[in-house]
């Protein structure tokens, strides 16, 4: 299969079909461990949302993430996006808060069912955002954000809680001269940028991921879903750009109307003080006809 026939691994649909399926669970574990730097070390996980084909066909506007439980009371949510569509930081926090709240309720309900004393159990939630475009000003390709007190003159930097952690992986910032095949973070970022990168083809995990990608790319139904998904994503971005342009134009129109109203008000004051129509036109920029109508 030639390179041109491979579907884009950075598509959220294709990414999930490669990494978010049970048969490739060990690939997902490898990817997560490489990003988390084995803190914690994931040895097994349960993928929580594997069903996607029906969802994608019925609702093409959804975001296809991978949700997994990596340890008891510890969850990971992985998102991949080709483009920076804006407000990524806010959405990342929102998604993690929703996962934390949902699983907090589930843990509390389990205690209730077991007849135990009900207490709020807060799970740990880790968000991983793999971005095709840059979203931070940080120099490194992988950065972790957490909830913390910033340093002051009297206090040091202090992490408030380890319950919420967010990792941003910015593929545009990854351009090493040499890929260390023993460093799986390098390997996976290279794969996500170019699955056919010659430097990583002898890595067993890459071979397995690439075989899956080739199978998906050769499947007629999978390609149909992929192109439908791409069409919808591009349509969404275009609609968003149009909406932004319309909002900007509306803002400019309001500014023009406000400026015109201020000129009219100034012209009326000048008329009341006996200034000539010609002078008022010169001072305000209003035409002679506009001044005469006041």
Predicted regions and their residues:
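Low-complexity, glycine/alanine/valine/leucine- and proline-rich hydrophobic stretches
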Residues: 153-167, 183-195
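Accessory alpha/beta interaction modules
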Residues: 1-165, 175, 246
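Short, charged alpha-helical interaction segments and adjacent helix-coil junctions
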Residues: 2-4, 67-72, 76-81, 179-182, ...
